[in-house]
Amino acid sequence: MLNNSPLYLKQDMVIRDEEYCRKNGLMGMSDTQLKAYPNAWRSWPRNYGGNYGDNSDIPLWNGLARSLNTIAIRVGDLVGASNIFNFVYNTLQLNTLDPVNDVGLAQMVMGSQTHGVTPTALAAAFQIFYDGQYTTPHLYTRVLDRDGNIYLENNSTSYQALTPDTAYVMNRLLKNVLYSSVGTAGGRYPNSNGMEAFGKTGTASDEKDLWFVGGTPYYVTAVWWGYDAPYDMTKTLGKQQAKTRTCVMAWKALMEQVQADLPYKAFPTSAGVVERRYCTQSGLLAGGSCTSTAVGYYRADDLPGTCNYSHAAAPAAAAPAETAAPEQAVIPADTGNLDTD
């Protein structure tokens, strides 16, 4: 059971109910006292704030926008922890990950890794949600001597990490974090000549590490907020303030400054992706009896079926209320490119 609750720290271990263990044959009177984590047999994962959800159906765009751990773990379980690890380690070059200890859902989905990743590596990884291309990160291109001769040259490499179809669908999914009313960074997109953006928030369970990765048609930026000596930032900020007034606001201010004089640019679309209205109750393409619909983005060769339900019950998840741009609720991207085993 402990293996299903992987996020406990060793210092959290306490002695549990020995009488219960003895009655159930788990230990004898002469056994050394057993130790287990608090609530070791609880359900896992929990969402930020400690809840497990309400057992209602939630479309993927909503779970991602709200940063629900339960939805993320479910998707990660479908893809497979080893497939995710192989993709991010080999294709996205996140080489600070541990091939022995970091192949698991807690590590790959929740970020509970042995050493973690750097902001540079994280920004490089998120660049694939522009057009699917990955370029090795570098801090300079070339160094010239006083005569104009090349003294140093950084030869970065580029390759296709995702198909353009998958990259565009993921781009639309991540846009909801900033533009949907339920997004963890809802309304905090840069005001940059009408250019769109995408992003993802991240918060450690002890509020000692805050993250935001944001992308625009020009830049991808990763922001980490914390202390060299880890400190619980909710001691000076509330939980919501820690999430919404730190990384994402710093990123928003930076993007508005660096993009102030840049001409308008749009994210590239993909000819293999189509827009369709879908039923927010069933997740299927909207049928004639669907009363609550939203726009989804789908691979043209992988459309879901059409909904034919009567919809007598209340909606499972309402259509997203946008904070600015038109609604952009989307369905999962193709995960076939992650199958690198």
Where are these regions (language model features)?
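C-terminal catalytic domains of large/alpha subunits in multi-subunit enzymes
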Residues: 75-78, 86, 93, 281-285, ...
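Conserved catalytic neighborhood of penicillin-recognizing serine enzymes
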Residues: 2-84, 146-176
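Mid-domain, small-residue-enriched loop/turn segments at the edges of structured enzyme/sensor domains
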Residues: 29-47, 80-124, 137
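Extended, hydrophobic alpha-helical segments in both membrane/secreted and soluble proteins
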Residues: 1-3, 23, 71-72, 84, ...
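Thr-Gly-centered strand-to-loop micro-motif
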Residues: 74-75, 111-112, 199-200
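A penicillin-recognizing enzyme superfamily signal
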Residues: 3-12, 62-66, 115-322
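Periplasmic/cell-envelope proteins involved in peptidoglycan metabolism and beta-lactam response
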Residues: 4-13, 82-89, 105, 253, ...
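Long, low-complexity, intrinsically disordered segments
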Residues: 325-341
